[in-house]
Amino acid sequence: MAATAAGVFRRTPEERADQRLAWNRADQPFFAAGACHILAWVCRDTYPDRPIGLAGLRFAGERQVFHVYATWADRAFDHAGWNPEAELLAANREFERRSLDRIAIVDDMATFCQAQHHRMPHEYFGDPLSRARDYVNRHPLPWR
């Protein structure tokens, strides 16, 4: 699947206000907007023998991260599966029509979620960890 901007799947005001409605979205929109950080952490944790990192995107000069993804070599994993990171960055930059900053994420999930006002897994309507594990396992690996 081609790299696609996370903003294409941005939640509606209704989905932001209703966790059940947000939970019931298809997997790609769910992991593009609202649970991208869960997917990234699960991807990294699924392959502990690989040097998988975490990265985030934010609008240039701003503090708030709006999209999180896993990285390995020159590849990125998010709602669109594994793609060249350069393509993921270009798709998001083009969609947002703004400059973006890419940052490395080194905090644990709890620290990141608190600092960035993201939900922890237990704050979702259902279990996003098992849903993310299933989603990660559907995508071919770039190192094979």
Pin down the residues of each PLM region.
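A structural boundary/capping signal
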Residues: 1-144
